[in-house]
C-alpha cells in the first residue's frame, strides 16, 4: 500500500523502542478486569497459559510487573516456535504441554492473526478488541466477542 521503498522495518523497530521506553518509565498498563478474570479462573481451577510472540524474558517481566505471574501454569513464547501466528503452532504446543485437547481450551485474543491461529488449531476463541478492528472473515471464526476482560467470567460460566 505504501510502496516497496516504505521503511517498514525501520519504523517498526522505532515503534518497539518507543513502546519499551514507555513501559520502562510507566510500567505495563493492565487491561481492565485482568486481575478479576485471573482470580475467577483460579477459583474455578481453570488452567491459564500465555501464548505470545513476545520474547520470554519480556513476557515474564510484564507478568511480574502486573503481579499476575503466579496465575499462569505455562508461558509459551513464539521464540521457541518455528511458525508464528497465524499458524496454529503456538496454541497447539501449549495444549500439548498442558495435556489438553484443543477443543477443551479457549483462546482470548485481540489480534486477527491470533484469532486465525486459534481457528487453525480448532480452539474456540474470544475476541476482546483492543486498538485495531479485525476483518469480517476472522470475526466469523470467533466464538464470542467481548468488550473487556471484565466480561470473561460470565462468558466462561456459559460453558460450565
Predicted regions and their residues:
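Short coil/loop linkers at secondary-structure junctions
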Residues: 4-5, 29, 69, 101
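Residue-level "hotspot" positions that anchor or transmit function at local structural transition points
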Residues: 29, 50-51, 82, 99
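Pocket-edge positions in alpha/beta enzyme catalytic cores
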Residues: 3, 26-29, 82-83, 144
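N-terminal-biased segments
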Residues: 1, 48, 63-66
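A metal-dependent, Asp-based hydrolase signature
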Residues: 1-22, 32, 40
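Asp-based, Mg2+/Mn2+-dependent phosphohydrolase catalytic module
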Residues: 35, 39-42, 56-160
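Short, acidic loop-to-helix structural element flanking the phosphoryl-transfer center
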Residues: 21-50, 56, 60
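Conserved acidic
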Residues: 7-8, 26, 86, 110
